[in-house]
């Protein structure tokens, strides 16, 4: 299991056994890098999946309610990603929420 950088270049194809987890998908990170920086956005994303109630000071009440259900779903369905490579447009040298998903799967594997 590894992170793949998805590309928009002509002829690029996503490898077999790879799941795109970018922003428009149900696995996307709602915390924007432009607002928080990459490290903080990834950290909050991971914390929200681990402990759903901890991360809503950055959101208004309506958005927090929506994201609560979304992160709850992610925590309950994380195993769907096991054994897949995860693709996102983030540079491989930058922090990415796909790495957080991979880390969480490794943690779940140990318990």
Sequence positions of predicted segments:
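Catalytic phosphate/metal-binding cores of nucleic-acid and nucleotide-processing enzymes, i.e., regions
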Residues: 1-111
């Amino acid at each position: 299991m590894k992170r793949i950088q998805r590309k928009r270049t002509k002829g690029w194809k996503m490898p077999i056994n790879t799941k795109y987890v970018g922003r428009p998908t149900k696995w996307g990170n709602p915390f924007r890098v432009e607002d928080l920086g990459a490290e903080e956005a990834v950290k909050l994303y991971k914390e929200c999946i681990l402990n759903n109630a901890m991360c809503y000071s950055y959101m208004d009440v309506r958005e927090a309610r929506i994201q609560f259900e979304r992160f709850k779903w992610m925590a309950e369905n994380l195993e769907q990603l096991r054994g897949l490579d995860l693709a996102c447009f983030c540079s491989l040298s930058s922090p990415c929420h796909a790495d957080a998903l991979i880390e969480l799967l490794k943690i779940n594997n140990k318990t």
